[in-house]
């Protein structure tokens, strides 16, 4: 019992000594803190900081200005311009859907009025399309494809500039006759080559059938047929690489026809540049001939 009392008394004394030391530490710090507080709150040359804070009128302090970002907008004239452009494109789209090359002026006005919404804007749109060259208005007829009119006028001007008894017409007739004979001969040669190819394939098929059912067996002919088919595919691939043409019967015919046509023209001394020049001069809608490559 005596030992327990001694230990308990010792613990109580230690606790009391710790609390006393803490209070003495804060007592030592408090005068220093008060001194710092007075130093910041008072000013030797004017009113102290407390009076300044109390004298501030909060309602007189204006809030910070907000930065307003400029808003990009369209003016009335720009809006009208965009609306007019939209209406014009809408009218052009309606005109492109018409399969005919020309319509009456009344139908043209109706299309413009339906696209624009009223008669006044439709009339203005029709005049704008006429002035811009999108259509050609001649009397009561409106031509929807001005480029065709331009080509026709160009051909007519060329024809009127040519004399009725121009000797170049005879030259064009001779060149056209020579070209026609060259085309006929080239076509005949190519058709003969294609018939030879058909005969070769028929003989090859008959030979493989005889070897399969009479001479040999399918076990022997199966790899042979596979390799022959592969060789045909390789030949078609080489044809495509050299000519950039699809390896079909039509592509083969066209390519062989161009090759034979070129050789025959060189043999007969045919001037294809002169032929194109005269053809465009004396023909209303010329079809230019391209030299075979």
Curated annotation (Swiss-Prot):
Keywords: Calcium, Calcium channel, Calcium transport, Ion channel, Ion transport, Membrane, Metal-binding, Mitochondrion, Mitochondrion inner membrane, Transit peptide, Transmembrane, Transmembrane helix, Transport. The chain crosses the membrane at residues 189-209, 220-240. InterPro entries: MCU_C (IPR006769), MCU_fam (IPR039055). One of its GO terms (cellular component) is mitochondrial inner membrane. GO terms for biological process: mitochondrial calcium ion homeostasis. Pfam families: MCU. One of its GO terms (molecular function) is calcium channel activity. Ca(2+) binds at residue 222. The keyword Membrane applies. Residues 1-5 form a transit peptide. It is found in: Mitochondrion inner membrane. The keyword Ribonucleoprotein does not apply. PANTHER family: CALCIUM UNIPORTER PROTEIN 4, MITOCHONDRIAL, CALCIUM UNIPORTER PROTEIN, MITOCHONDRIAL. Mitochondrial inner membrane calcium uniporter that mediates calcium uptake into mitochondria. Constitutes a pore-forming and calcium-conducting subunit. Mitochondrial calcium homeostasis plays key roles in cellular physiology and regulates cell bioenergetics, cytoplasmic calcium signals and activation of cell death pathways. Belongs to the MCU (TC 1.A.77) family. This is Calcium uniporter protein 5, mitochondrial. It comes from Arabidopsis thaliana. The gene is MCU5.
